[in-house]
Amino acid sequence: MANKVKIGILNLMHDKLDTQSHFIKVLPNADLTFFYPRMHYQNRPIPPEVNMTSEPLDINRVSEFDGFIITGAPIDQIDFSKITYIEEIRYLLQALDNHKIQQLYFCWGAMAALNYFYGIKKKILAEKIFGVFPHLITEPHPLLSGLSQGFMAPHARYAEMDKKQIMQDERLAINAVDDNSHLFMVSAKDNPERNFIFSHIEYGKDSLRDEYNREINAHPERHYKKPINYSMSNPSFQWQDTQKIFFNNWLKKVKDNKLVLN
């Protein structure tokens, strides 16, 4: 695997095995190492599926990787200060920054990183952004190369970062939004290795259905709206091209950066 780029992934998602499978599929030509936050399991046993497929996060290993991903997490309605492992996340963010590793942050991971690096505030939404939506490219970026206006991508979150704050920060660019102006991608002009993605473009075609079913099974007393522009009975992989193009672009960015550093 010497010729492969090495990617570390901090997997914070609810379905650890599904998430791992998704990233293995979208990054087939990379050497992937999955991690879990140590502080999350300080006072409770580590689930077997986590222990078997992931390693405890070791900040000292960050420099081994050419790229690093922090996934989403089902905690976007919780204040950052209340997250039991937030300090561990911040140590990781600082280490990634120190070593200038290519960074890709998804959903909650993007929220935590934007808050840490730029002080951007998180806002809880009146209702969940949930479904598959067309998108507008507002500022071109290499990671969006090959995507056309109207490209499709899935969203599933209860919070949004403060767009006004982002727009007022000259270090940041909003590169794409959905048709309701919800964030898809924010990039850092001051540190081009940082990229923040608010869509779950790693999802497979059944993932939105699985997420909906998981929520209603966990809380049958609550009302959950079904995903928009998405058939629960016959899901369509409308974002497959988006997924392939985006991750190919990011892998190219990681490889190019590795060549420069070497």
UniProtKB/Swiss-Prot annotation:
Pathway terms, separated by semicolons: Amino-acid biosynthesis; L-cysteine biosynthesis; L-cysteine from L-serine: step 1/2
Keyword Transmembrane: no
Gene3D superfamilies: 3.40.50.880
Subcellular location: Cytoplasm
Catalytic reaction equation(s): L-serine + acetyl-CoA = O-acetyl-L-serine + CoA; L-homoserine + acetyl-CoA = O-acetyl-L-homoserine + CoA
GO cellular component entries: cytoplasm
Annotated positions binding substrate: 128, 214
Protein name, entry field: Serine O-acetyltransferase
Upper lineage: Bacteria, Bacillati, Bacillota, Bacilli, Lactobacillales
